Amino acid sequence: YYHNKVVRIDNVDFILSTLWSKIPSVDEFAIQNGMNDYAQILYNKRRLIPQNINDEFERNLAFIKQSVMESDADKIVVVTHHLPTFAALDERHKGSVLNTAYATELGNYIADSRITAWIYGHSHHRTDLMIGNTHLVSNPLGYVFCGENTNFDDSAVIGV
């Protein structure tokens, strides 16, 4: 598992980070009380709180931006767990108070960047979209026991 690492393969830089989401203070209570993560995960030996997530988000985003800026590769692929835009959320979740636990709106940054592709997960929903010249794609299996993602494509290939 790589976190905040860059791996170069054939002049393509893969920038790998969790990219925790940015949780606005207005959403903190609902997210902390509405998601199991906050009851189950310890952060520095204490219960996880939204501020921990926001601190990690700032570190992750700074790493991604610095790595993109420093890259001299022909192509750049960013790989994150969390979604880099609300546009990638499943329609059934649009407007949910929990959305900022899954995604952060980086659309303007992505559109202005030289990132070739951005691969992400966490949503348990297959997506394929473009922001500027960047191809954003997710093909998660989701929770198998409940048949969550019937759109999963086990033969999917992402070309860069």
Residue spans of the language-model regions?
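Structural signal for conserved beta-strand scaffold positions within catalytic alpha/beta enzyme cores
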Residues: Y1-H3, L16, S138
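A substrate-binding/cap region within the structured catalytic cores of diverse enzymes
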Residues: H3-I9, L19
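Short His-Asn-centered micro-motif
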Residues: N4, Y120-G121
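Binuclear metal-dependent phosphoesterase catalytic core
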Residues: V7-R8, D90, V97-T116, H124-V160
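Divalent metal-coordination and catalytic microenvironments
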Residues: F14, H81, H122, L136
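Active-site-proximal loop/helix segment associated with metal-binding centers of metalloenzymes
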Residues: I15-V77, P84-H93
